[in-house]
Amino acid sequence: MSDTESSTPSQPIVVVEYCKICSLPTEYCEYGPSAKQCLKENGPHPNNNKNTASGKDSSNTTATTTTTDTTTTTTTSTENTEEKLKDLKIVDDSKEVSHVDAGKSESKEATGEEKEKEKVSKKKKEVKPQIIIEVNQRNKRKHVTKITGLELYGIKLSDAAKVMAKKFSCGCSVVKSISNPNSEDIDIQGDFGEELVDLIEEKYPTVPLSEIYFLEDKKKVKAR
């Protein structure tokens, strides 16, 4: 034996175990395609456990550091928020009327007024003009028949007075109304209440008989 051979130290033989499932060395099974099946078959490799433990320790240390930093940041931001809230004043707007609410209330009031106007206009439209016939006694034997409201149906009073004077052969004239100075009545000399209703029905068919009334003791009574 030479001096060179005697001076070289002998190295231990390394035995490599191969996995029966993935055909990789068992210490690399965890990186293979079937790591779970390899772990069941071979169990954990000693080298991998050490690496895993060290990895876990380092990850735990990093997580702890990160958590501490996060907690510190959160605490600082919370303190800043509390300081800002102290400077704020709480304002109660529940009792104040906003522009939108005011606009709504105004629109509701306007709508209510319009509805009232519509109701009044409808009532006015529904009210039909009435013709009132009143027979008054003058002296003991004389009577005067007064008719009011013919002009409301577009009848010219002067023409109607001529028709009545001719029909009843009596005096007939257009006079100012006592109850309403702005309107006029027709006065007929005599008692012609019922005959006057027949004349209106014959000569003026546009006038509904249901709107002709007799005025008796200051009360209106339908003529027909």
Curated annotation (Swiss-Prot):
InterPro entries: DENR/SUI1_TIF, DENR_C, DENR_N, SUI1, SUI1_dom_sf
GO terms under biological process: formation of translation preinitiation complex; translation reinitiation
Domain SUI1: 131-204
Annotated region described as Disordered, given as residue ranges: 35-124
GO molecular function: translation initiation factor activity
Comp. bias regions, Basic and acidic residues: 81-119
Biased composition, class Polar residues, residue ranges: 45-56
Superkingdom per UniProt: Eukaryota
Biased composition (Low complexity): 57-79
CDD domains in the cross-refs: DENR_C
Annotated SUPFAM superfamilies: eIF1-like (SSF55159)
Similarity field: Belongs to the DENR family.
Protein name: Density-regulated protein homolog
Taxonomy of the source species: Eukaryota, Amoebozoa, Evosea, Eumycetozoa, Dictyostelia
